[in-house]
């Protein structure tokens, strides 16, 4: 019998299994030669889908950025990330292949890796052995050393931004917060994730990005060895205070030499903190030298020679455009002057690194593309007519996209037609609040997943102080590139979307916007049509000024929270009594414009209200108690005649996700007519409001518990939530209708949908690992 058929008795026909590819997909979406398939993840700046080359079958991760849904600042960070990824070619850094675009979308074709996030790996395995932790740590340090050698600071290192390939080797992703730190200048933008951010960043002080990365590396190493974070608290203000003090418990099972390394990296004083060079000479780091790691072997280098350029006419327009996206070379006259200088400087190093990348991997137009009928198909960003190192112009490619023009208003600097068209269209772009609403991640998974926060409006990386270029050697060595990958997302809009709003120029200033949230820290939900984004709620005042205030507030919150998949924690707000006891004298940081400190005052409690009519108070109280008793693993206590305190804790699943939900239930009489007496003489039911207030724990689980209680109070016979909670107690995972197929980030395709929109990945008392904002997951 053939494996492809099934015989039936009595002359019944054979049933053939369907052919795996009976016919090509009717509505297949293409980005260049890549056919878009399943969604891999969702980040702050875009969705990520799996792309498969239509001829070679090569897999890539395609990040889809909706330019109409993101603020100009976020789009500018995407352009900056593109430029930075062009600078970095290292075996442990995620690689950028190509960039495509049309009027509405930007498509980043990234390396695809199949091992997922280091965070998920750590949650699954628990704390790692010192040997395995050292392997990961050495790969991270190797990649960081390469980045820092070219003045690139990541600024958002955390296990969620570290991907694993099929051989469990590290790929650093999400350079959305990365910045060039030129010369001896310091950075000013407070960005990152509070659990991994260093004290000087939290305080809002100027800081050295390289030393900030070292602190984050120390926290990551601690998490690898312990399975928990050194600083953690359900209350955001308390968490930030712990980070500023820098006091943490060192478990006894960590090897003594590794303990000294951790204390040297997680050091409050930046000047005393270990540098990369000191880390690489540390005994514990060197202890792994006998452990072979082919990925750490130095790859064959490529020497990049620098020379002076006698005239502006020899400057490559594509390279200049990439340098402008970096944000620290805005003074065009100074940039041209430094490039023409005979002295060695940072500008020339960056210029020739980008030029070398362009010459070795030229971006040409695709050949033999599949036939498409898209109205506005994605077009590849191809090179402009390129100058050789000897000033001779190379043959021009046959494409309208590769022509260059001279921008008379910018001193005659060459500007590619693509960028010039975008600048011409920018003046027509709508600047409504809803037009800049959605913020997805900036990591290649999402991410790139992370926005940079700033209180004062600053374009791009304008917060970085521009210092004089430090001398650099005339030759730079670039390692040959190796295999890489990564990606994660949600159902993206089709590349052929007919929407015609014109995009703004990626290089133009943009607000540091993000995703407007329906409540202070609620998770943004995908719209029914799959478009990633939501419309912000009206401002309290309802006026234009209020809308602007609301937009700015949402931008601030989103900038702090970063990627939706890991930053959904319901932060606790300090009480009025606590805040009244704090003064600039008792806490000097309150007087500073630190984004961490200011964010606290913007948060509010999470509450759910239920109005009940024609039910007496005694009946409502009885129904609430009955609902409490019907939910497994829920305990309650009576605070007063009309108040209850409840706690729900699931007993199934890994201990790392057993964060209890604590909430309070208050019953109050609403305004309304006096209840009329019943025929039997008892008073009739009035109008009562039942308020459920989350005290601590995962927001998503809190909502599910409240839905179950509401079903009881409304006398609903169909109560699927009760069964869901029971399944959860037994370790089963459920996915509510409409929940995107994502987990922890919520990366789609992950098996645990219950975590997809949980506010926090979080822990039990003895073993817990927290995501960037420390929000515990169920």
From Swiss-Prot:
Phosphorylated at Thr-189 by STK11/LKB1 in complex with STE20-related adapter-alpha (STRADA) pseudo kinase and CAB39. Not phosphorylated at Thr-189 by CaMKK2. In contrast, it is phosphorylated and activated by CaMKK1. May be inactivated via dephosphorylation of Thr-189 by PP2C. May be autophosphorylated. Disulfide bonds: none annotated. Residues 1-12 have a biased composition (Gly residues). Serine/threonine-protein kinase that plays a key role in polarization of neurons and centrosome duplication. Phosphorylates CDC25B, CDC25C, MAPT/TAU, RIMS1, TUBG1, TUBG2 and WEE1. Following phosphorylation and activation by STK11/LKB1, acts as a key regulator of polarization of cortical neurons, probably by mediating phosphorylation of microtubule-associated proteins such as MAPT/TAU at 'Thr-523' and 'Ser-573'. Also regulates neuron polarization by mediating phosphorylation of WEE1 at 'Ser-642' in postmitotic neurons, leading to down-regulate WEE1 activity in polarized neurons. The lineage of its organism: Eukaryota, Metazoa, Chordata, Craniata, Vertebrata. The modification Phosphoserine is found at residues 193, 399, 443, 447, 450, 508, 586-587, 601. Its EC number is 2.7.11.1, 2.7.11.26. The gene is Brsk1. Residues 362-383 have a biased composition (Basic and acidic residues). Residues 314-356 form the UBA domain. This is Serine/threonine-protein kinase BRSK1. Activated by phosphorylation on Thr-189 by STK11/LKB1. It holds the Pfam family KA1_BRSK. One of its GO terms (molecular function) is protein kinase binding. It is found in: Cytoplasm; Nucleus; Cytoplasm, Cytoskeleton, Microtubule organizing center, Centrosome; Synapse.
